[in-house]
């Protein structure tokens, strides 16, 4: 299993280090690792083979072999593993007072609020897709959800632009997510070909 940091983290961490010092840097990075550990535990509990983990500004991304072949329940638990871990860390910060506990609380709340948005590729979107997509129309369900996610992000970016410069970091994150979805949307036809080949091999 490979572990890597996405290059987009560098400017984010530089900005955090300049604005909040090394403490903010450490809390954010530690929180993202803990969040991703929740996904990893969920993947292992459901016997999923994790090929790699990439840490991103909003959490992380697990590359899982044959992800779509797992049950709806397994994919739902995988999506919720990170938010559950973040919620546990939030509860600890709320009940145990320690230096920086308020900063930990704020960061966990931000990670939760962002990750539970009902759009791809965030955890909220992954969970909703796992609940609603149908095996016989998976390609069309995912395409519709991708288009919804792109539209949601475009509207969100337009709203956030009115709050510059305070919203610069959120705008950067929204643009990154939008570009991710556009990239997936462009290559979705190859996923359809793969699913058709797999279906033909089973019949």
Language-model-derived ranges and their functions:
Residues 1-203:
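Hydrophobic transmembrane alpha-helices and their immediate loop junctions
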């Amino acid at each position: 299993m490979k572990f890597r940091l996405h290059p987009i983290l560098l400017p984010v961490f530089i900005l955090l280090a300049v604005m909040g010092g090394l403490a903010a840097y450490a809390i954010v990075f530690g929180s993202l690792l803990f969040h991703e550990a929740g996904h990893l535990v969920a993947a292992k509990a459901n016997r999923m083979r994790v090929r790699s983990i990439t840490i991103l500004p909003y959490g992380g991304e697990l590359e899982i072999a044959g992800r779509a072949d797992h049950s709806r329940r397994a994919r739902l638990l995988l999506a919720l593993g990170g938010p559950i871990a973040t919620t546990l860390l939030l509860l600890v910060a709320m009940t145990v007072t320690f230096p920086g506990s308020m900063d930990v609380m704020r960061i966990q709340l931000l990670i939760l609020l962002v990750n539970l948005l009902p759009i791809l590729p965030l955890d909220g979107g992954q969970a909703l897709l796992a609940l609603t997509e149908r095996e016989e129309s998976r390609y069309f369900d995912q395409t519709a959800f991708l288009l919804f996610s792109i539209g949601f992000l475009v509207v969100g970016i337009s709203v956030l632009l009115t709050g510059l410069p305070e919203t610069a970091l959120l705008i950067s994150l929204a643009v990154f997510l939008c570009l991710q979805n556009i990239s997936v949307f462009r290559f979705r036809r190859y996923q359809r070909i793969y699913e058709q080949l797999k279906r033909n091999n089973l019949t």
